[in-house]
Amino acid sequence: MIKVYRYEIVKPLDLDWKEFGTILRQLQQETRFALNKATQLAWEWMGFSSDYKDNHGEYPKSKDILGYTNVHGYAYHTIKTKAYRLNSGNLSQTIKRATDRFKAYQKEILRGDMSIPSYKRDIPLDLIKENISVNRMNHGDYIASLSLLSNPAKQEMNVKRKISVIIIVRGAGKTIMDRILSGEYQVSASQIIHDDRKNKWYLNISYDFEPQTRVLDLNKIMGIDLGVAVAVYMAFQHTPARYKLEGGEIENFRRQVESRRISMLRQGKYAGGARGGHGRDKRIKPIEQLRDKIANFRDTTNHRYSRYIVDMAIKEGCGTIQMEDLTNIRDIGSRFLQNWTYYDLQQKIIYKAEEAGIKVIKIDPQYTSQRCSECGNIDSGNRIGQAIFKCRACGYEANADYNAARNIAIPNIDKIIAESIK
């Protein structure tokens, strides 16, 4: 199991902040170039492969065409001379990040459901695990030694060794760091990030450890239904217990922020024409800060929701969580579900569930809101409005979200539904 903890960089040891900041900014520029170029090459290879398949009846072998077994190798060969300041291992990790992301979303890109990934200015710097080490000094400071530069860049910048930095370690971060130093946790690929709003640099240390094992029953399943009025509804088949997370705070926050954003845009639109240049930048900055506020609220809320969900699954002894596959979320017809990042919430649930030893299964949600969780009858008329479910066949009546969550908690429910509607 891999987790991440963020440590603030206090200062570099062998450089002043101006020198260190210059190095990090230059590496950010090269990282951005590498990510975008690798994505471009992956896109071009996908297009070439598709045309080749149409003309020859089979996909090309990258070794024959590119001279490398995969796009990652070809991209590294193409990019390394232009992103020459980056440590070779870190550059390889950066290119892998771009090609892996492109591959993960290739189908969505082809369908037109999402645009080709692009990377902006303040992006993380990658560090492979071999290029980061941490130690505690006799006076108590924690030092992280980082291999950031290639040999030519070291000569160019007059840096003779690894760059060492003092990091702030306290609270839960101290426990994690002490376990890393004791060998209980292992450092894995990490990142350096910049918080533009605070103008601070952080070291995101990833660490690997064996998750605690709990006695959980795989046959006990929690079903999760995602909605609007109730953001998350949790139900089970082995117990009448139910839990829910109201969606009101999310919707209220979204409306407030959207209203504020529109107001800011109008103010910028009608501002005097003479207020150009830096004046425009000043007007845009609050809008950018609003975006940060939205992102922070989303991240915090989804962390809180996912923790509660997994905790309730453990409480009920569930070894399995089943939830909706939201790949085609737009087909659901809810604009709210599109606005709120349910994908991010699901990723956090999966992450925390796996950490607890819980299996996560995604199911096709079609008809789960129309099916009676008591008798299995499927009828669009069973759903009376947004909140009430009443079965036309057996008369079972319940909260509509609870009924859907109970259906989702049934093993192989999507297959059962597919058979029943044939």
UniProtKB/Swiss-Prot annotation:
An asymmetric homodimer. Guide RNA is probably required for dimerization. The gene is cas12f1. Zn(2+) binds at residues 372, 375, 391, 394. Residues 1-126 are annotated as: Recognition domain (REC). Residues 400-420 are annotated as: RuvC-II. Belongs to a group of putative class 2 CRISPR-Cas systems, type V-U3, which lack the proteins involved in adaptation. Pfam families: Cas12f1-like_TNB. It comes from Sulfoacidibacillus thermotolerans (Acidibacillus sulfuroxidans). Has an asymmetric bilobed structure, with a recognition (REC) lobe and nuclease (NUC) lobe; the sgRNA:target DNA is bound between the 2 lobes. The REC lobe (residues 1-312) is formed by the WED, ZF and REC domains, while the NUC lobe (residues 321-529) is formed by the RuvC and TNB domains. Has a split RuvC-like domain with the nuclease active sites. Disulfide bonds: none annotated. Residues 127-211 are annotated as: Wedge domain (WED). This is CRISPR-associated endodeoxyribonuclease Cas12f1.
